Amino acid sequence: MAKKQYTIINSSSTLDTYTEYDLIESPAIVSLKNVENKGLICVGSWVEYRTVDNSGNEITCISVQDANTGDVFSGQSATFRESFSDVVDRISDMEETPDMFFIEVLHRTSKSGRDYLICALVSPDRALARMGYTEKNIPMPEPQK
């Protein structure tokens, strides 16, 4: 099988071969559309990249790896990419930039009836409480290597 052709636009860090494969080429990648509304992802690694779809059209995609499970979620939704970029900018402005952060995937419907995706930053305390942890100061998972 030929290597998928793509150009990385932006990423969480310099990606090693395994992480790049997981985020862009792996057949185990799940569509962001399949994440339930308000589903939490503990973002570890992520990448935004350009590739070509089956029709030969250039598309921009984003892939996010859950640091807890290693699962990768990917999609080409412009609204999701824009909201994710806003979250990354917000995280980058923090005094202590975390290696990981929580987002929730939100399914919305436009006034014209079209479905679209966005994401929102979730505080670690709120995310952990939603995951069933009641104690404070629960350590974040180690980043996936």
Would you name each region that the model predicts?
Residues 67-79:
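Short, basic/aromatic beta-hairpin or loop at an interaction surface
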Residues 40-43, 62-64, 98-105, 118-121:
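Hydrophobic beta-strand residues in large extracellular and virion-surface proteins
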Residues 1-69, 112, 124-126:
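OB-fold ssDNA-binding interfaces and closely related basic DNA-contact patches used
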Residues 82-103:
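Short nucleic-acid-contacting surface segments enriched for D/E, G, S/T with interspersed K/R
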Residues 104-143:
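OB-fold/S1-family single-stranded nucleic acid-binding modules
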Residues 1, 144-145:
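Short intrinsically disordered terminal tails
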Residues 77-82, 135-137:
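A short, sequence-level motif marking secondary-structure junctions
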